[in-house]
């Protein structure tokens, strides 16, 4: 599924590979969909390590970068697990 097909209120995942090795995975919750403007909460991991969380990530679906990315619908629990992983990493830093 392409970025133009994303629906508000749904969860998706994207994966990026280099030489068959998963290097980046993102989980998306689409919070707003208005014409070509898409807003999402996004959790991003690089090589299995939590990297970032975006609470208000904007996507313009004509952007060339996102045109080549394939989205797969996923369950809310997968997004939640990714957020929990980031929280664990942040708590570990506090020590």
Locations of regions flagged by a protein language model:
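Short intrinsically disordered terminal tails
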Residues: 1-2, 6, 91-95
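Intrinsically disordered, low-complexity, charged/polar segments
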Residues: 47-95
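SH3/SH3-like beta-barrel fold
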Residues: 40-41
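Glycine-centered loop/turn motifs
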Residues: 9, 24-25, 57, 84
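Short, exposed beta-strand/loop patches in secreted or surface proteins that constitute
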Residues: 4, 29-32, 72
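Short beta-strand-centered aromatic/proline hotspots
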Residues: 22-35
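Acidic surface patches and DE-rich sequence motifs
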Residues: 14, 18, 33, 46, ...
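Short coil-to-beta transition motif at edge beta-strands of beta-rich domains
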Residues: 4-18
């Amino acid at each position: 599924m392409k970025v133009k097909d994303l629906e508000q209120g749904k969860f998706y995942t994207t994966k990026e590979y280099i030489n068959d090795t998963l290097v980046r995975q993102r989980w998306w919750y689409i919070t707003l969909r208005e014409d070509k403007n898409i807003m999402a909460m996004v959790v991003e991991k690089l090589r299995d390590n939590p990297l970032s969380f975006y609470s208000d990530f904007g996507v313009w679906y004509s952007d060339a970068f996102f045109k080549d990315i394939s989205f797969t619908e996923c369950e809310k629990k997968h997004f939640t697990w990714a957020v929990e992983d980031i929280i664990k990493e942040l708590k570990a830093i506090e020590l």
